[in-house]
Protein backbone atom coordinates (compact mmCIF):
# COMPACT_ATOMS: atom_id res chain seq x y z
CA UNK A 1 0.00 0.00 0.00
CA UNK A 2 1.67 3.21 -1.16
CA UNK A 3 1.49 6.59 0.53
CA UNK A 4 -0.65 7.94 -2.29
CA UNK A 5 -3.08 5.02 -1.96
CA UNK A 6 -3.81 5.49 1.71
CA UNK A 7 -4.06 9.25 1.27
CA UNK A 8 -6.64 8.72 -1.47
CA UNK A 9 -8.57 6.40 0.85
CA UNK A 10 -8.54 9.03 3.58
CA UNK A 11 -9.76 11.63 1.12
CA UNK A 12 -12.63 9.34 0.12
CA UNK A 13 -13.56 8.84 3.77
CA UNK A 14 -13.44 12.56 4.51
CA UNK A 15 -15.58 13.36 1.46
CA UNK A 16 -18.24 10.91 2.59
CA UNK A 17 -18.23 12.34 6.10
CA UNK A 18 -18.69 15.81 4.60
CA UNK A 19 -21.52 14.55 2.39
CA UNK A 20 -23.25 13.05 5.43
CA UNK A 21 -22.91 16.35 7.28
CA UNK A 22 -24.42 18.32 4.41
CA UNK A 23 -27.18 15.76 3.87
CA UNK A 24 -28.03 15.56 7.57
CA UNK A 25 -28.25 19.33 7.91
CA UNK A 26 -31.09 19.34 5.37
CA UNK A 27 -33.30 16.82 7.20
CA UNK A 28 -36.40 17.39 9.31
CA UNK A 29 -36.98 15.44 12.50
CA UNK A 30 -39.58 13.27 10.73
CA UNK A 31 -37.03 12.43 8.05
CA UNK A 32 -34.46 11.45 10.67
CA UNK A 33 -36.95 8.98 12.15
CA UNK A 34 -37.86 7.39 8.78
CA UNK A 35 -37.25 3.61 8.65
CA UNK A 36 -34.57 2.32 6.26
CA UNK A 37 -33.90 -1.04 4.62
CA UNK A 38 -31.53 -1.88 7.51
CA UNK A 39 -33.73 -4.02 9.80
CA UNK A 40 -34.91 -2.04 12.81
CA UNK A 41 -32.94 1.09 11.91
CA UNK A 42 -34.12 4.57 11.02
CA UNK A 43 -32.17 7.19 9.09
CA UNK A 44 -30.91 8.51 12.43
CA UNK A 45 -29.93 5.02 13.59
CA UNK A 46 -27.62 4.59 10.60
CA UNK A 47 -25.70 7.70 11.58
CA UNK A 48 -25.66 6.61 15.23
CA UNK A 49 -24.04 3.36 14.10
CA UNK A 50 -21.26 5.26 12.32
CA UNK A 51 -20.68 7.36 15.44
CA UNK A 52 -20.46 4.29 17.64
CA UNK A 53 -18.00 2.59 15.30
CA UNK A 54 -15.68 5.60 15.10
CA UNK A 55 -15.81 6.09 18.87
CA UNK A 56 -14.90 2.46 19.42
CA UNK A 57 -12.08 2.41 16.85
CA UNK A 58 -10.71 5.67 18.22
CA UNK A 59 -10.70 4.40 21.80
CA UNK A 60 -13.09 7.18 22.74
CA UNK A 61 -15.34 5.05 24.90
CA UNK A 62 -18.20 2.64 24.29
CA UNK A 63 -21.69 3.14 25.68
CA UNK A 64 -22.76 1.36 28.86
CA UNK A 65 -26.35 1.44 27.61
CA UNK A 66 -27.98 -1.91 26.84
CA UNK A 67 -30.66 -2.18 24.17
CA UNK A 68 -33.61 -4.37 25.13
CA UNK A 69 -35.02 -5.12 21.67
CA UNK A 70 -32.53 -7.40 19.91
CA UNK A 71 -34.97 -9.29 17.65
CA UNK A 72 -33.19 -8.29 14.45
CA UNK A 73 -29.65 -8.80 15.83
CA UNK A 74 -27.76 -11.78 14.38
CA UNK A 75 -24.33 -11.78 16.08
CA UNK A 76 -22.24 -10.22 18.88
CA UNK A 77 -21.02 -7.37 16.66
CA UNK A 78 -24.60 -6.62 15.72
CA UNK A 79 -25.52 -6.56 19.41
CA UNK A 80 -22.71 -4.11 20.15
CA UNK A 81 -23.90 -1.92 17.27
CA UNK A 82 -27.46 -2.03 18.58
CA UNK A 83 -26.41 -0.78 22.02
CA UNK A 84 -24.69 2.21 20.39
CA UNK A 85 -27.70 2.93 18.19
CA UNK A 86 -30.32 2.54 20.91
CA UNK A 87 -28.38 4.81 23.26
CA UNK A 88 -29.08 7.71 20.86
CA UNK A 89 -32.71 6.99 19.94
CA UNK A 90 -34.06 9.48 22.49
CA UNK A 91 -31.98 12.26 20.92
CA UNK A 92 -33.01 14.53 18.08
CA UNK A 93 -31.53 14.00 14.65
CA UNK A 94 -29.78 17.36 14.95
CA UNK A 95 -28.11 16.27 18.20
CA UNK A 96 -26.89 13.03 16.64
CA UNK A 97 -25.55 14.95 13.64
CA UNK A 98 -23.69 17.30 15.98
CA UNK A 99 -22.04 14.33 17.70
CA UNK A 100 -21.15 12.87 14.30
CA UNK A 101 -19.48 16.14 13.30
CA UNK A 102 -17.53 16.25 16.56
CA UNK A 103 -16.32 12.65 16.40
CA UNK A 104 -15.32 12.82 12.73
CA UNK A 105 -13.41 16.04 13.38
CA UNK A 106 -11.43 14.23 16.09
CA UNK A 107 -10.84 11.20 13.88
CA UNK A 108 -9.69 13.33 10.96
CA UNK A 109 -7.21 15.17 13.18
CA UNK A 110 -5.88 11.83 14.42
CA UNK A 111 -5.44 10.38 10.93
CA UNK A 112 -3.86 13.56 9.57
CA UNK A 113 -1.26 13.49 12.36
CA UNK A 114 -0.51 9.75 12.12
CA UNK A 115 2.84 8.62 10.63
CA UNK A 116 2.93 6.60 7.42
CA UNK A 117 3.73 3.33 9.19
CA UNK A 118 0.40 3.60 11.05
CA UNK A 119 -1.33 3.00 7.73
CA UNK A 120 1.05 0.35 6.39
CA UNK A 121 1.42 -1.77 9.54
CA UNK A 122 -0.94 -4.73 9.87
CA UNK A 123 -3.83 -4.76 12.33
CA UNK A 124 -6.96 -6.82 12.91
CA UNK A 125 -9.75 -5.93 10.49
CA UNK A 126 -13.17 -7.41 9.59
CA UNK A 127 -11.37 -9.52 6.96
CA UNK A 128 -8.49 -10.67 9.18
CA UNK A 129 -5.01 -9.19 9.54
CA UNK A 130 -4.36 -6.44 6.99
CA UNK A 131 -2.76 -2.99 6.79
CA UNK A 132 -4.66 -0.19 8.49
CA UNK A 133 -5.03 1.38 5.04
CA UNK A 134 -7.16 -1.61 4.04
CA UNK A 135 -9.27 -1.19 7.17
CA UNK A 136 -9.82 2.44 6.18
CA UNK A 137 -11.07 1.30 2.77
CA UNK A 138 -13.64 -0.81 4.60
CA UNK A 139 -14.57 2.19 6.76
CA UNK A 140 -15.01 4.40 3.68
CA UNK A 141 -17.19 1.72 2.10
CA UNK A 142 -19.28 1.28 5.27
CA UNK A 143 -19.86 5.01 5.63
CA UNK A 144 -20.83 5.42 1.97
CA UNK A 145 -23.16 2.41 2.02
CA UNK A 146 -24.97 3.69 5.11
CA UNK A 147 -25.20 7.15 3.56
CA UNK A 148 -26.94 5.51 0.61
CA UNK A 149 -29.21 3.54 2.99
CA UNK A 150 -30.27 6.86 4.49
CA UNK A 151 -30.75 8.56 1.14
CA UNK A 152 -32.71 5.68 -0.33
CA UNK A 153 -35.19 5.71 2.56
CA UNK A 154 -35.94 9.35 1.77
CA UNK A 155 -35.56 9.06 -2.03
CA UNK A 156 -32.87 11.75 -1.99
CA UNK A 157 -30.13 10.79 -4.46
CA UNK A 158 -26.63 12.09 -3.85
CA UNK A 159 -22.89 11.39 -3.60
CA UNK A 160 -23.10 8.51 -6.07
CA UNK A 161 -20.48 9.76 -8.50
CA UNK A 162 -17.74 9.93 -5.87
CA UNK A 163 -14.42 8.38 -4.91
CA UNK A 164 -16.11 6.39 -2.13
CA UNK A 165 -18.69 5.09 -4.60
CA UNK A 166 -15.91 3.83 -6.87
CA UNK A 167 -14.00 2.35 -3.94
CA UNK A 168 -17.15 0.55 -2.78
CA UNK A 169 -17.98 -0.87 -6.19
CA UNK A 170 -14.40 -2.05 -6.68
CA UNK A 171 -14.32 -3.81 -3.31
CA UNK A 172 -17.66 -5.47 -3.99
CA UNK A 173 -16.48 -6.56 -7.44
CA UNK A 174 -13.63 -8.49 -5.80
CA UNK A 175 -16.22 -10.82 -4.28
CA UNK A 176 -17.93 -11.64 -7.58
CA UNK A 177 -15.75 -14.67 -8.43
CA UNK A 178 -16.92 -16.27 -5.18
CA UNK A 179 -20.53 -15.52 -6.10
CA UNK A 180 -20.14 -16.94 -9.60
CA UNK A 181 -17.94 -19.92 -8.78
CA UNK A 182 -19.25 -21.10 -5.42
CA UNK A 183 -22.71 -19.71 -4.82
CA UNK A 184 -23.96 -19.85 -8.40
CA UNK A 185 -21.82 -22.95 -9.13
CA UNK A 186 -21.10 -21.89 -12.72
CA UNK A 187 -19.86 -24.92 -14.71
CA UNK A 188 -16.29 -25.45 -15.92
CA UNK A 189 -15.32 -23.27 -18.87
CA UNK A 190 -18.30 -20.95 -18.54
CA UNK A 191 -18.03 -17.18 -18.63
CA UNK A 192 -20.17 -14.58 -16.89
CA UNK A 193 -20.04 -10.89 -17.80
CA UNK A 194 -21.42 -8.26 -15.43
CA UNK A 195 -21.77 -4.69 -16.64
CA UNK A 196 -22.43 -1.98 -14.05
CA UNK A 197 -23.78 1.20 -15.61
CA UNK A 198 -23.80 4.79 -14.40
CA UNK A 199 -22.74 6.50 -12.25
CA UNK A 200 -19.85 4.09 -11.51
CA UNK A 201 -19.18 2.11 -14.69
CA UNK A 202 -17.50 -1.29 -14.52
CA UNK A 203 -17.40 -4.37 -16.74
CA UNK A 204 -16.29 -7.59 -15.08
CA UNK A 205 -15.67 -10.82 -17.00
CA UNK A 206 -15.40 -13.99 -14.92
CA UNK A 207 -14.34 -17.37 -16.31
CA UNK A 208 -14.34 -20.74 -14.51
CA UNK A 209 -11.07 -22.64 -15.12
CA UNK A 210 -10.07 -25.79 -13.22
CA UNK A 211 -13.01 -25.29 -10.91
CA UNK A 212 -11.98 -21.77 -9.96
CA UNK A 213 -13.79 -18.58 -11.00
CA UNK A 214 -11.36 -15.82 -11.95
CA UNK A 215 -11.66 -12.28 -13.28
CA UNK A 216 -10.18 -12.09 -16.80
CA UNK A 217 -9.49 -9.22 -19.18
CA UNK A 218 -11.02 -11.02 -22.16
CA UNK A 219 -13.68 -13.77 -21.97
CA UNK A 220 -12.30 -17.14 -23.09
CA UNK A 221 -15.68 -18.14 -24.50
CA UNK A 222 -19.07 -16.71 -25.34
CA UNK A 223 -20.64 -15.52 -22.08
CA UNK A 224 -23.10 -18.00 -20.65
CA UNK A 225 -24.71 -15.16 -18.71
CA UNK A 226 -24.58 -11.42 -19.20
CA UNK A 227 -26.25 -8.97 -16.85
CA UNK A 228 -26.37 -5.20 -16.55
CA UNK A 229 -26.85 -3.43 -13.24
CA UNK A 230 -27.61 0.23 -12.73
CA UNK A 231 -25.18 1.42 -10.10
CA UNK A 232 -27.38 4.05 -8.45
CA UNK A 233 -28.35 2.14 -5.33
CA UNK A 234 -25.76 -0.63 -5.71
CA UNK A 235 -24.27 0.04 -2.29
CA UNK A 236 -27.54 -0.67 -0.51
Question: Predicted regions: what is each one?
Answer:
Residues 165-208:
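A glycine-rich beta-turn/hairpin centered on an aromatic-Pro dipeptide
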Residues 21-42, 110-130:
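Helix-loop segments that flank and shape redox-cofactor active sites
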Residues 1-34:
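Non-cleavable N-terminal signal-anchor transmembrane helices
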Residues 1-8, 56-113, 117-119:
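Short, helix-capping/interhelical loops that line the mouth of catalytic, cofactor-
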Residues 218-236:
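C-terminal interaction segments
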Residues 33-75, 125-180:
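Short, contiguous alpha-helical
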Amino acid sequence: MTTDNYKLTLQSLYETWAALTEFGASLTEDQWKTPTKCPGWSVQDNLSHLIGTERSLGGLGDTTHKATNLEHVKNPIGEMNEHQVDARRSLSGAAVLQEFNEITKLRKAFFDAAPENFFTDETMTPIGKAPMATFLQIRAMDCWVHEQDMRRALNIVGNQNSASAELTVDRLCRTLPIVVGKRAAAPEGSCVVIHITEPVVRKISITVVNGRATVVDTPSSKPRVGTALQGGWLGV
